[in-house]
Amino acid sequence: YYKTIARINELEPTFEKMTDEQLKAKTEEFQRRLQGGENVFDIQVEAFATVREASKRVLGMRHFDVQLIGGIALHQGRIAEMKTGEGKTLVATLPSYLNALTGRGVHVVTVNDYLASRDAEWMGKIYRFLGLTVGCIQNHMDDRERKEAYACDITYGTNNEFGFDYLRDNMKYDVESLVQRGHYYAIVDEVDSILIDEARTPLIISGPSEEATDKYYIANDIIPKLQRGHKDEETKVTTGDYIVDEKNHSAVLTEQGIAKVEKLLGISNLYDPANMEILHCVEQALKAHTLYKRDHHYVVQDGQVIIVDDFTGRLMHGRRWSDGLHQAIEAKEGVKIERENQTLATITLQNYFRLYEKLAGMTGTAETEAEEFATVYNLDVIVIPTHKPMIRKDYPDVIYRTLEEKWDAVVKEIQEKYEKGQPILVGTVSVENSELISERLKKLGIPHNVLNAKYHAREAEIVAQAGRKGAVTIATNMAGRGTDILLGGNPEFLAREFLKRKEINPDEATPEQYEEALREAKAIVEKEHEEVVALGGLHILGTERHESRRIDNQLRGRAGRQGDPGSSRFIISLEDDLMRIFAGDKLRSMMKWLGMEKGVAIESKTVSKQIERAQKAVEARNFEARKYVLKYDDVMNKQRETIYGLRRRLLFEKDHREYLVGEHGVARDLLHDLTEMYLNPKVPRYNWDVDTYAAEIESIYGVDPAVDAGVDFKTMSPAEIEERIWQKAYANYEEKEKIIGAETLRAYERFIMLNIIDAQWKDHLLSIDHLRQGIGLVGYGQKDPLVEFKKQSFDMFQEMLDRIDINTVKALFNLQVVVRDEQEEIERIERLKRQKARRGAAAYTSAYEGVAAAGEESKKHTPFVRKQPKIKPNDPCFCGSGKKYKKCHGAES
């Protein structure tokens, strides 16, 4: 790394002497060299020197040597761990520019829309100066805007937007409507949050299913009638109707509970396959009542259950728990139960980001999860040194017995810092706790800001000023990530505030007005900066340890940026969730031994180590949970790649004739398989299933073997029969092609195949969901559920591929071509003219539209001879969707 940096630094004087035009011309030079056979590593040193110089001229910011190290690590496809305030946003410009020169597109992934638009605008100035284009994906954009953004050299957006665009692209019916153009290189900002915290939640595009919701009310009424029990770890004896294990986040019925549920439902065996659906509802209702707490895991607003994000405390509008859990909670809360959604497309974030040829990430805290990054994503973590030495003081944890004692101590510490003038940032794990502290501070008359993590842009403004003298800011742990807390405040944000006070819109202010406000702000900030440094910098106060050490480290990392002074402390109690569930018994006995009294805190490194051990245990458990999700999704991933690969081939290749009706096409292979199945040459002719074979052939190919193809089952060999049928079916197909034209038929083929693939894939995903729900039961038969899942899902996938082939051939060979002759068309027009004369112009218009839409009125004198039997309402629909005709195209007609 240091040799490369030395070479970049050597070029700096040369680049400083260049004019703007000469510097901009470097982009075209690099692109020419790449086209001439050089690779990105050959031009890395010069490209980095170019970006550094452009940044100095455009933003007035020069990349430090440690930022160059970060840039090199990212270009190599690694994770750069850089402490808060070390300029991660600027670091990303180096590898983004270099890799964008290939013309294949670079994706910069952020945690929210606000940061995506802020960084695209802010860093975009460098890229635009150097002649590259920059796009930004925002939640509200339509397909046209998204396509334009993806066509840019560098595209900013959130992980969800990138992932959902990928899924939506794989549901499109023509190439022009695709928005993404491939997955070459991605830089993931706050990589730990995106690739680890959110990795257990798959991205799902869903539509309403046809399942009824009353079963959730039935299950919900049963739970209050059950008694909670417990399991004696020594004797293994269980009591009560169900056991709740908070540590493993599970709730299960006991033998006694199963018997009681069976009695309440009036069934003999709850585990009978016929009762699997109600069993699943009872299990989810039990979880809803015992493991999910209102105002902690979710809130009820406007008659809806809205999930609260564990990590940020944000309300996750539009997100729903899957597997019937959301419906169970809706039943518990007595709100309207929304129909369970059926999955149309899904992918985990792990498998989405594995699509990229090269992946890199940045964060302030990745070292604790290095093993997971290596195992799942094959990414190394490189710890980048800080530009200036870290001088923050991290004090040991202070532990109280009860929550009440803890909150008293928290408020007391806030009051002390406020009276001294030292800025303090208080981190909480939930919105509920933020409001609790806020109420107490109001009673004491202490002014403060509360970040309830709902508005990212407003968050940035509050967080930016959290370093001002006497500032008290309460925030959920992760709120306002991506914005630095500058001691004394942020002059740019303060200048905007001054303009607003003068009733001037900051975005419409003249350069003179803005400069004046900025000068005023800088003078105040510089004075306050010195005062805050003298007081010890920003103090971080954590009010509860998070399950993940990384989240605690992120909170601490808000102080002590770029060599600034700062301090941090956690005040916790034995009644906190983490302590109660994971470290309770050992710590309680330790506290007794230490002689802990009411209102007296203890500071002990031994206790802090005990807490860290508890956190490591939780992290290990969560890692296992993510690995478990990934193992199952890996099975699906192979299937998804096959289906999406087939779809893309259909979209991008214009001619599928050979694939469908060629010598070794789908239709010919299917005919061969059917002939082998029913007319096996290895068995005597009298054992052939001729009737079923003839019915299948007529159903799929629209050919009666005996009548249309002249087949004699008594004398012909299977090969001759197959050849006869194929000649007739193929001739019919060619006839249709002559009538409607090759181009029209190719378009129809593509539409039909995509339609059938989507319908079958949707049904397959539903079947897989059901399989996954019940697969755990095979463990009782001493079988590995994962192995069994792989086996059964593979068989189901093969069956689905067979259905796709059969339905495609059936739809194409049974295509009805209706041709209206010239005389008929003349008569139709004459009839319309007579109608016009009788009813007047207005009625004519109406009649014309009606006839044009129906298209059949004009043919009443021509007898219609049906080649195929009439489709009855309950028959499967001809389009291959798998639905009944009356619920599919029958409903439309």
Positions of PLM-derived features:
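Short, P/G- and charge-enriched loop/turn segments at secondary-structure junctions
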Residues: V175, F864-V865
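Short, Lys/Glu-rich amphipathic helical modules
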Residues: G421-S434, F652-K654, E658, G710-K714, ...
